[in-house]
């Protein structure tokens, strides 16, 4: 018999910051380890695993919360391109997706993405863009995203993180 997975997807709040940071750290340190060198992760993860207060309060960032109250997934979207205030009409950007390593492959990230797509479409978004880690590229492909190009994302003056730029047209 398969156990039932019970969780809700809700809007994040600023009070979720510590739990989201812990979730990002648990997820990225485990799930990225087989795709990136340890030395790179040691330099990059401190920048990548801190919850973004602007995203948390945006009304477009979501958390999956288990029936026991723990945060087991997160992710969202923004109209602004990451790292800028630039907005391109009809375009949105997928932001800070993660699933706790003990809860992967249960549809949690897909549930959050479905919520992102629904809410983005309600804001007249027709195309989603994301900057995927190598570990998440197949997840995004399974959701209909196409690979556009490789990229190196600057995280600090001495830290650049290899990634994959992807996009998807919303139906």
Question: Which residues does each predicted region cover?
Answer:
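Acetyl-CoA-dependent GNAT
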Residues: 7, 11-15, 22-102, 113-115, ...
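Alpha-helix N-cap/helix-start capping motif
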Residues: 14, 133-134
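Conserved G/P- and acidic residue-centered "switch" motifs that form tight phosphate/ATP-binding loops
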Residues: 107
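Conserved short alpha-helix immediately C-terminal to the canonical SAM/SAH-binding motif I
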Residues: 112, 136-139
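Conserved GNAT acetyl-CoA-binding A-motif
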Residues: 113, 120-133
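Conserved catalytic-core motifs of GNAT/GCN5-like acyltransferases
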Residues: 129-131, 146-165
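Conserved active-site tyrosine of GNAT-family acetyltransferases
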Residues: 140, 145
């Amino acid at each position: 018999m398969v156990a039932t997975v019970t969780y809700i997807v809700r809007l994040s709040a600023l009070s979720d910051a510590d739990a989201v940071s812990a979730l990002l750290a648990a997820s990225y340190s485990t799930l990225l380890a087989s795709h990136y060198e340890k030395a790179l992760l040691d330099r990059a993860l401190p920048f990548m695993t801190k919850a973004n207060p602007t995203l948390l309060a945006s009304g477009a960032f979501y958390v999956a919360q288990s029936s026991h109250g723990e945060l087991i997934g997160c992710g969202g979207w923004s109209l602004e391109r990451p790292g800028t205030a630039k907005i391109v009409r009809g375009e949105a950007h997928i932001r800070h997706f993660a699933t706790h390593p003990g809860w992967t492959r249960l549809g949690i990230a897909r549930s959050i993405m479905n919520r992102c797509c629904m809410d983005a479409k309600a804001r007249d978004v027709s195309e989603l863009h994301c900057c995927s880690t190598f570990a998440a590229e197949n997840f995004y492909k399974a959701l209909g995203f196409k690979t556009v190009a490789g990229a190196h994302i600057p995280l600090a003056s001495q830290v650049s993180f290899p990634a994959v730029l992807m996009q998807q047209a919303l139906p």
